[in-house]
Amino acid sequence: MHSRTLIKNAIIVNEGRTFVGSLVIDDDRIEEIIEGKDVKPQLPPDSVIDAEGCYLLPGVIDEHVHFRDPGLTAKGTFYTESRAAAAGGVTTVIDMPNTVPPTVTKERLLQKIELAQQQSLVNFGFFLGATPDNAARLRDVNPRLVAGIKLFMGSSTGELQVEDKPTLRTIFEQSKLPIMVHCEDTPMIMAKMKEYKEKYGQDPHVRYHPEIRPAEACVKSTKEAIALAREFDVKLHVAHITTAAELDLFDPNDKQITAEACLPHLMFANEDYERLGARIKCN
């Protein structure tokens, strides 16, 4: 059944502007955006939603999600996580490759696409994981299938860590797609872990987590990734930066090299480990 809906007098955020206006939806398509308060649309609506005082935003694109499908579905599936995304106003997601098995070949990518086509309630894309085995072939990756390359320069879930310097150079040289990178200096972290285990036993208290994985480990690795991106003229996006020291490495006007932050790193500080413990622990 054909239906026209008017969302009126909302605070609309769109294309770099914020203004009071109304939106006309014809079935499932946006037909008209009207600037101004109480402005009537060209055709009468079937239903009206008064959104005065509320913000109206376009669907959010989340370019860093971990839907855990396949292989880790006790944590989530394309259906459960895309349902949560839709409920939060996220209409497009780009999923990470550290699943089981990891998404590092065309065959595994196609399997993942098929899973998402069957289950996802929102638009989706995928990152291909960079490894020593596929580094020399990244130039041949089909941009219609892959949104970008995910590179783990630090240890995380999925056994996808790459630290070998020649391999890192090959990845940046071969990739014609944007590279998203997880930046941590693992040797520095391992040395700190050894030091703290010698001091405090095999299971150091979580309060020491920010000292075992220090900001310096992130800064050092991030500087290396930025230098490689500049050398090979590759678009780079640094994932989940955690400190002001990292933020200082980026120019907000430079669209070639960008970064993101996660909400926990904005909401909590090192002192909160005493109160909240492992609930806020994150590499």
PLM regions and their residue ranges:
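Divalent metal-coordination and catalytic microenvironments
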Residues: 10, 23, 28, 53, ...
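Histidine/acidic residue-rich metal-binding segments in metalloenzymes
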Residues: 136-283
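Active-site metal-binding motif and surrounding structural segment of the metallo-beta-lactamase
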Residues: 39-56
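Metal-associated gating/positioning segment near the N- to mid-region
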Residues: 54-119
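Short, surface-exposed connector motifs at secondary-structure boundaries
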Residues: 90-94, 119-123, 226-235
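Alpha-helix-loop-beta-strand connector modules within alpha/beta enzyme cores
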Residues: 106-122, 170-181
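N-terminal metal-binding scaffold of metallo-dependent hydrolase/deaminase domains
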Residues: 1-42
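Active-site mouth loops of central-metabolism enzymes
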Residues: 63-76, 99, 122-134, 211-215, ...
